[in-house]
Amino acid sequence: EMTDESPDAPLPMELPEWDLSDLYLSIDSEELARDLERVTWDAKGFAAEFKERVGDLDGDALAAAIARYETCQELMGRIGSFASLTYAGNVEDPEIGAFFQDTQEQLNLVGTDLLFFSLELNLIDEDALAHLLECSTALQHYRPWIRDIRVFRPYQLSDELERLLHEKDVAGRTAWVRLFDQTMVGLRFDVEGRSLSSEEALH
């Protein structure tokens, strides 16, 4: 008689799945499509209003701009997290793979529209920024965030190079990560006479 302790006992194949419904119900969710369209247009509107003007804003106006930037970033994070976790949960599904790739490309375009903001913020002189912070209680709320952004100030490249590096991310590092995932999916391992994927074998 075969028992659970027997080497011939069937391996458990049911792996746990993430419940991502707090983010979106599915890759075909209407809410997801609306949010992606919304953040796309919000980013374009943000760029149209503030690009090449960040250094001219007073403290309260800069705080309001940061709040709008933060809203875009949070929505991008929600969409990106859902896409990444959905893909990680089933890298073998070609439909999910295509969804993940398309979402990454669209979010990259949104990020490109927003890229100018942190770059221009870092161009503000230290004394000028200190004055803005002193005169605006609203801006003081974002002091830790501004400090963290400006840590990278000495290493900032020209706007053109920063934009180019950002645009190439989908075809660069991100593409290599996806290639690794797809390669791992294609691997099969013989475990007690059964052909298992790497995920099944590890669990």
Q: Can you name each region flagged by the protein language model?
A:
Residues 1-203:
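A well-structured
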